[in-house]
């Protein structure tokens, strides 16, 4: 009995250490930088009390550079499943307080496991990224972990919704997986994603560039088109993910949940007769028409800052989730250029995959 008590005490201590990630000091630094911890993010994202964590006590296997003497349970990834509005989702979050959220061979297995479970159960998967990239102490083994993650991203594409949030300085491999998912969220002035950071750019091509210019939320929201949603805070971002999920089905064999609607489907709006000018050379805002047609005049726009000459997003009609694609006469006369075509076609493919 005494031995069992000792074993249980050891387990409880490891569980406590895992819950603290990199420790109290690192958590304080995370908060000082204006960021939440991985566990705080998951708690805010999911319905209260629904999170079930997997592989909480896993540690890395690296013995190089004294790493064998510095093992933290959880190894920088918090993963598991829970519910959003009563619907099952799978989630994993990089813990920046543990080795800068770097990817190891071991914690890559945690991510792959959750990806496989999401695919098997036909449920959306959400990635909360706050990672410096590969763990250099592990060399090629860490990079191999990325290959496994990317493979699962491609296998899940068009089968289950994949959503990524960039919540810190994500470089290298930490950017590639999000780019393979369906939707990316970023936070103004807090989120950055780039293949290599400003220091490497300066060393290689002798060009000075800030983190914001190279890979900030505005850059990817308006220029590269990599990110779909730019938010003002982490709290807003996490709530926006919950809202996006409300428009989506669980998988490609399902349909989006129909919402109760008090908006009369047969209502008429006289303003629709006057929004479009008689002169075809006079611009108007297509969003005015969209908002008058959809339920409760609410339109959840996707990629609002990129290729503004075309509008895409989700809304509801008679309580059913619909995808909307519309030319925007108020910007470049609503012409179809390369960026607008890419923006619209990708959205149409997504809606087609998920019965929207």
List each language-model region with its residue ranges.
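Terminal-region recognition feature
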Residues: 1-163, 169-176, 180-200, 205-356
